[in-house]
Design a protein with these regions (language model features):
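Positively charged n-region of N-terminal signal peptides that target proteins for export
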Residues: 1-11
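Catalytic-core signature of thiol
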Residues: 9-351
Length: 351
């Protein structure tokens, strides 16, 4: 039997096709068939999208609005992927029914633009002359599975926890998933944090230096659903950190040297349609800007088809990007913010 939701979908499809036919000035049956075929194909993709990501809309009007947004994004994805000069592909993901403004407000507004003042982190710089050609910390049990921040501006906590997880694993030989919720709830204004309204990775490191960090199991993440911070409560810290370091700004050789030692927190610009729909390949200069708005984790670097890249772990789940990861173009510049601003604010903790 059809559900009410199935009937809504069917009504909207019929309405949509009828509108196309009534407004069409096409001169032949072949042209008409092509247009209707494209519209039906887009609707099928939208239906598959709803099923894949468990999307439910409250009314026919909302479904129509979301289909319109999906269709615009889907057309942009197809147009991009048909351009053989591009170094990366785009694809349908959980954000394809969101406008750029909606995407920005919910998923790329969790990083404070200015660095935390007087964070207490040391300075780090190096020529990276002895760094290996490729690094992937996932292969050395220093990276936990991709997580999902949900509808909370807590990217900074996932970036910071990932860097701390890596540092602890490399130092102690044990990979432990740490609590982002502890940082959301407990690292307040003293550490430059406003919970789901943003924060800085350096502030998270300073909190961990002062208090230690609890495990994900002991203090599980809930703000992705509640969309707000909870009440800070005590837990038994299992990982402790002694200091943090800020990598020399705009110096990709120093960043390379740091990543050769351990995963490194970075801030990037993610407020573009390219990042919203990124699927695979290497993001390049035309793809994003340098207005920092999102915290992520660099877990390695390498090259692909002659293009150097940084390997970056995101916090939007495995449905986004390349199983939750993105490759961002890399260079050997020592005076350049890098693609998406990747070299502007790198930092890492020490055990």
């Amino acid at each position: 039997m059809f559900s009410i939701y199935n009937i809504m979908q069917y009504i909207l499809l019929l309405t949509f096709v009828a509108t196309v036919l009534s407004q069409s000035n096409l001169r032949g049956n072949s042209d008409l068939s092509a247009v209707v075929g494209d519209q039906v194909f887009e609707w099928k993709e939208f239906s598959n999208f709803q099923e894949r990501f468990s999307k439910k809309y409250s009314s026919l009007e909302e479904m129509e609005e979301r289909f319109s947004v999906f269709r615009e994004n889907f057309r942009a994805i197809r147009q991009h992927n048909n351009d053989l000069s591009q170094n990366f592909t785009m694809g349908i993901n959980q954000f394809t029914d969101l406008t750029p403004a909606e995407f920005k407000a919910t998923y790329v507004s969790g990083l404070k633009a200015a660095p935390l003042q007087a964070s207490g982190c040391k300075s780090f710089s190096s020529g990276a002359s002895s760094a290996p050609e490729t690094v992937d910390w996932r292969l050395h049990n220093a990276v936990t599975p991709v997580k999902d921040q949900g509808q909370c501006g807590s990217c900074w906590t996932f970036s910071a926890s990932g860097a701390m997880e890596g540092a602890w694993s490399i130092s102690k030989g044990s990979l432990v998933s740490l609590s982002e919720q502890e940082l959301v709830d407990c690292a307040g204004l003293k550490y430059g944090s406003m919970g789901c309204n943003g924060g800085q990775m350096d502030g998270a490191f300073k909190y961990a230096i002062d208090n230690g960090m609890c495990t994900e199991t002991a203090y599980p993440y809930t703000s992705g659903v509640t969309k707000t911070a909870g009440t800070c409560h005590s837990c038994s810290a299992v990982d402790h950190f002694s200091s943090c370091s800020d990598v020399k700004a705009n110096d990709q050789l120093s960043l390379k040297a740091a990543v050769a030692q351990q995963p490194v927190s970075i801030a990037i610009s993610a407020d573009t349609k390219y990042f919203q729909s990124y699927s695979s390949g290497v993001l390049t200069s035309s793809s994003c800007y340098t207005s920092l708005d999102h915290g992520v984790l660099t877990v390695g670097y390498g090259s692909e088809n002659g293009q150097k890249y940084w390997l970056v772990k995101n916090s939007w789940g495995t449905s986004w990007g390349d199983q939750g990861y993105v490759k961002i173009a890399r260079s050997d510049s020592t005076n350049d913010p890098g693609i998406c601003g990747i070299a502007m604010q790198p930092s890492f903790p020490s055990v």
